[in-house]
Design a protein with these regions (language model features):
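Short N-terminal "domain-start" leader segments
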Residues: 211-213
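N-terminal segments that cap or nucleate solenoid repeat domains
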Residues: 1-44, 221
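A short, exposed loop/beta-hairpin motif centered on an aromatic-Gly-Thr core
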Residues: 227-235
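A short, charged, amphipathic alpha-helix used as a generic interaction element across diverse proteins
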Residues: 234-249
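Short "repeat-start/strand-capping" segments in structured domains, especially the N-termini
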Residues: 10, 36-37, 65-67, 96, ...
Length: 250
């Protein structure tokens, strides 16, 4: 699956949906399973801002080898944006794939997206804006993060933070404490993985994950885009992409 050309006749299509409540028993806005076959999600909005965080899980999740193309879709006001990979049963996921094209993920706590357990994620022309916001923050924050053998590649994407203290000073302390705890439990000795605040984690990898990026933009010097190669997108082009997607993905 390489783009919005679709899932094929044996797959599932979810389109033109405005989702304001979790539609799965686990609290997800949309859940994709490997047994669904290739799935296309297009022209959808997942906005769970009216629901308390304790009743929610992911905006969009993919488990058990899920394969999906998500295009022209907005995920907003959720605690956890997009998760690909089943942490409980990682052996089911090595064939899982996710393509995000022309999408907006904004005003979330974390996972924009998170990839784990060997899954492969490709992001094209996406805007990731304001992760770690106080209203959706729980224990830690990050935007795109690959770990445990997973990979994320970002092409022509924008990573944008309006503020550094998105969840206030207390949120920053809680976030750092939880990252330190995570790294301690995983016996990760890289000090950057311990001490980088979540609001700075634009595109990162740890614990055997890999990330790469080309022609991406970040609006703050402190946003980390690991694995970026070549020239970056300019501010004018980034603002144009943001305006285009905001205008289309209402």
């Amino acid at each position: 699956m390489t783009g919005s050309e679709g899932a094929g006749s044996s797959g599932r299509i979810i389109e033109d949906q405005y989702i304001t409540a979790p539609i799965s028993a686990g609290g997800d806005g949309i859940t994709v399973y490997g047994s669904d076959g290739p799935v296309v999600i297009r022209r959808c909005v997942v906005d769970l801002g009216s629901w308390p965080l304790e009743r929610l899980d992911e905006g969009i999740s993919g488990v058990d080898g899920a394969r999906a193309v998500v295009c022209e879709t907005r995920v907003t006001r959720v605690g956890k944006g997009i998760l690909w990979g089943n942490g409980d049963h990682p052996g089911t996921d090595p064939d899982a794939e996710l393509v995000l094209e022309d999408c907006i993920v904004r005003d979330i706590g974390r996972r924009a997206p998170e990839a784990q357990d060997g899954v492969r994620v490709l992001m094209r022309r996406c805007v990731i804006r304001d992760w770690g916001v106080g209203s959706r923050f729980t224990v830690r924050s990050f935007a795109a993060w690959a770990h445990d053998g997973a990979s994320i590649r970002a092409e022509d994407c924008v990573f944008w933070q309006d503020h550094f203290l998105q969840a206030g000073l207390r949120g920053l302390v809680v976030d750092l404490a939880n990252w330190i705890g995570w790294c301690w439990n995983r016996r990760d000795r890289n000090p950057l993985h311990w001490l980088l605040p979540g609001v700075c984690r634009g595109l990162t990898a740890s614990q055997g994950g890999t990330v790469s990026a080309v022609r991406c933009y970040k609006n703050r010097w402190w946003i980390r885009l690991s694995g970026h190669e070549g020239p970056r997108m300019g501010k004018k082009e980034a603002l144009a992409l943001m305006a285009e997607l905001e205008g289309r993905l209402l």
